Amino acid sequence: MTKHLPTISDISPLLKAEILAEALPYIRSYHGKTIVIKYGGNAMVEERLKESFARDVILLKLVGMNPVVVHGGGPQIDEALKKIGKTGTFIQGMRVTDEETMEVVEWVLGGEVQQDIVMLINHFGGQAVGLTGKDGGLIRAKKMLVANEKQPGGTIDLGFVGEIEAINPAVVKALQDDAFIPVISPIGFSEEGQAYNINADLVAGKMAEILHAEKLVMMTNIPGVMDKNGTLLTDLTAREIDGLFADGTISGGMLPKISSALDAAKSGVNSVHIIDGRIEHSLLLEILTEQAFGTMIRSR
């Protein structure tokens, strides 16, 4: 049986009022600060969650924060690949990307998915602008090679999977200054103009670092980081994370997510959280309430 996840309708009027009152100190604290949000998973698929996310981002902007959205699109890419008879292959949480897959990734992320997010935010009264790594030289990338765990010293070529060489934040800052909400697709480009598929978690983490973000929030399809017994780990340090990597608790798609979150924390991002994007208005609950939510990542 599918577990019921709460919606805004489940919250009593009194609790709603208490939440609004509770939000004031957080609004003051984050006023004028950059909040980077990695948006992905079910929150990008279910209509009610898509709408609640758009409204949340708009509210953050209206109360004086500077939200920057970095989106994924794994399910949409998988669906597009399925239509042309291809299946996704992942190594260490990274999608192996041949030339044909790269074309699909560019079309899905830079077109279909991004346009949907931008249009929804604009529909509800916000001002969103979509960007890829090519716009304003935002994300310069190079080919990523990952370590071959079965062959010490060896590497694995993932195709057109990229790692970030540099980020030019000028275009993002210009949009923020003009009251726009940047929506960034995780596609980078080399100096020669070659497009690369970059894991969205890595882009979000590096964007938070370069923009000197106050907060990085990563939305997932689970309550946060779980131990091997399925218990939520609400607070993790670098040392604890190393242990979870070593014993295999953190694996697959969580590898780049946790690595990126930890790197952001080490780089000076004051608050890094991994939260359950399946809960309606989870973004506001994380940023504007006292309630512990998801997993907080700390550098020490």
From Swiss-Prot:
The record marks 38, 257 as: Transition state stabilizer. It catalyses: N-acetyl-L-glutamate + ATP = N-acetyl-L-glutamyl 5-phosphate + ADP. GO terms for biological process: arginine biosynthetic process via ornithine; L-arginine biosynthetic process. Its EC number is 2.7.2.8. One of its GO terms (cellular component) is cytoplasm. One of its GO terms (molecular function) is acetylglutamate kinase activity. Transmembrane segments: none annotated. It is found in: Cytoplasm. Keywords: Amino-acid biosynthesis, Arginine biosynthesis, ATP-binding, Cytoplasm, Kinase, Nucleotide-binding, Transferase. InterPro entries: AceGlu_kinase-like_sf (IPR036393), AcgluKinase_fam (IPR004662), ArgB (IPR037528), Asp/Glu/Uridylate_kinase (IPR001048), Glu/AcGlu_kinase (IPR001057), NAGK-C (IPR041727). Substrate binds at residues 73-74, 95, 197. Pathway: Amino-acid biosynthesis; L-arginine biosynthesis; N(2)-acetyl-L-ornithine from L-glutamate: step 2/4. It is an enzyme of class 2 (transferase). Catalyzes the ATP-dependent phosphorylation of N-acetyl-L-glutamate. HAMAP family: ArgB. PANTHER family: N-ACETYLGLUTAMATE SYNTHASE (PTHR23342), N-ACETYLGLUTAMATE SYNTHASE, MITOCHONDRIAL (PTHR23342:SF0). Belongs to the acetylglutamate kinase family. ArgB subfamily. This is Acetylglutamate kinase.
